[in-house]
Amino acid sequence: MREVVSIQIGQCGIQIGNACWELYLLEHGINLDGSLKTKEELTASGSSASVGHDTSANDARTFFTETGNGKQVPRSIFVDLEPTVIDDVRNGCMRELYHPEQLISGKEDAANNYARGRYSIGKEVIDRVTSRLQKIAEQCDSLQGFLIFHSLGGGTGSGFTSLLVERLSTDYSKKCKLDFAVYPSPKVSTAVVEPYNALLTTHSTMDHSDCVFMVDNEAIYDICNNSLGVDRPAYRNLNRLIAQIVSSTTASLRFSGSMNVDLNEFQTNLVPFPRIHFPLVAYAPLMSAERSAHEQHAITTLTNACFESSNMMVKCDPRAGKFMACCMLYRGDVVPKDVNAAVSAIKSKRHIQFVDWCPTGFKIGINYEKPAFVPDGDLAKTSRACCMLSNTTAISVAFSNLSYKFDLMFKKRAFVHWYVGEGMEEGEFTEARENIAVLERDFEEVGLDNAEEGGDEDFDEF
C-alpha cells in the first residue's frame, strides 16, 4: 500500500484538515467513530461508496490505518502551539475518529510571530511531533509522502511549519512533501505582520518543499459570494470549499481509477525547475444547488471553467501569464474521449498560452469515483467534477503583492523587534526578501521565449 501522512498545523491547517476528513469519511463510507458503514446505511445515505464496499475500505488505506477490530483511524497529525483549537477537535463530533496521541498541542500561542513558531515556542513541541511521525511512518508498508496543511500568515502555520519541513527533509529526504498553503490575500487580512510571516516561510521552505498548492482567502471568499451565493461566508464555508479541492486532488491517491496520478507524479509533471513549485489550483463546477439544476455539466464546460480566473484559488489572471504545465484531474461520470476533445479545444484557444519549450504540457487523470458532498453544504451535488493544477507564471503576482507589503513595513523596521526578541536575526528578513526577488525573476525568465532570450544562437552548430 502506498500510504500518505497528513499533517495539519496551526488553527487554519487544523480547521481545513477537519473539513477534509469530514469529506473523506463520506467518500469512503466511514462513520464518525471510524467504523465502516453497513451496506444498508450506505444505500440509505446515497453514498458513492455503496458500490463495491470492500474496495472502498481498501482504497481508504492510503489515508487511514485499520485497527484489529476494523476501525479506520486517519493517518494524520494535528499540531498547534496553543490548546484551544486542538481542544475543539478533541471535543468535536469526530473525537472518536482521531488517535488521541496524534492531537498535539503546546501551552503557549505563537502570537502571529514566525520567530516564536520556529525558534522559541516551536522548539518545545517539535520533538513530540517528529517522534509521533516516526511511529506512524514505521507502521507504513511503503510511505509515499506527506501532505501539509497550514496558513502562511499565522505564527504556528508559518514558523512551526518551516521548522518541521526542514526536519522532514532531513529524516525523509526521498519522500514527497506537498503543501496546501493559505496565502495572505490582498484584502482579507487577519494580522498586520502576515507579509513578514509569509515571506519568511516561503524563503525557509523553498529548498525543502516539493510542491506548494496555494490558496488565497480572498479568492475563496469571492467564490463563496459570487458563485455559491453565500452572503457572509464563515471559515466553515471556506474550509469546506478548500476540502472539496483537496479531495479532488487526492482522489487519485485514495481510489483506484483508469488514469491515476501518484503523489510523486504531481511533482514530476508540474515542477519544471525545483524553485518553480507553486502550482495554481482551479475547480469546476463551482455553483449552488439552485443554479446547478439549470446547468449542463458537460466535460467541455468544466474544462473551460477551470481556465476562468473566477474558478482559481488565488487572485490572479491566468491570461496574463504563460503555462508551463497543466494537470487536469477529472472525477465521476467521465469518458476519456470527451476529455481528449475538451483538451484539444483548449489547446487551440489563443488566449491560453504555453511557454514555447513545453508545447504539450497536459497531464490527465481520470477517476470514476463521483464527488461526495457534505449534507447542507454550499456546493451543488454533481455527478462529475474537474480540478486543474497548473504551473503558470501568472501566480508570480501573489509574490509581488506580498513583497510590496513587506517592503512598506520593513523600510521602517516596523514590528521587527518582536522577531529579534524571539531569537531571530534581522539579517534573515533581508535574506528572505532577496530570495523572493530572485523567485520573481525566475518566473519572468521562465516565461520568456527562446527567441527573446537569444537562446537559439547557442544551437546554431547543430
From Swiss-Prot:
One of its GO terms (biological process) is central nervous system development. Gene3D superfamilies: Helix hairpin bin, Tubulin/FtsZ, C-terminal domain, Tubulin/FtsZ, GTPase domain. Keywords: Cytoplasm, Cytoskeleton, GTP-binding, Hydrolase, Magnesium, Metal-binding, Microtubule, Nucleotide-binding. GTP binds at residues 11, 82, 151, 155-156, 190, 217, 239. Its EC number is 3.6.5.-. It holds the Pfam family Tubulin_C. GO terms for cellular component: cortical microtubule; cytoplasm; microtubule; nucleus; perinuclear region of cytoplasm; plasma membrane. One of its GO terms (molecular function) is structural constituent of cytoskeleton. Mg(2+) binds at residue 82. Dimer of alpha and beta chains. A typical microtubule is a hollow water-filled tube with an outer diameter of 25 nm and an inner diameter of 15 nM. Alpha-beta heterodimers associate head-to-tail to form protofilaments running lengthwise along the microtubule wall with the beta-tubulin subunit facing the microtubule plus end conferring a structural polarity. Microtubules usually have 13 protofilaments but different protofilament numbers can be found in some organisms and specialized cells. This is Tubulin alpha-4 chain. It comes from Drosophila melanogaster (Fruit fly). The gene is alphaTub67C.
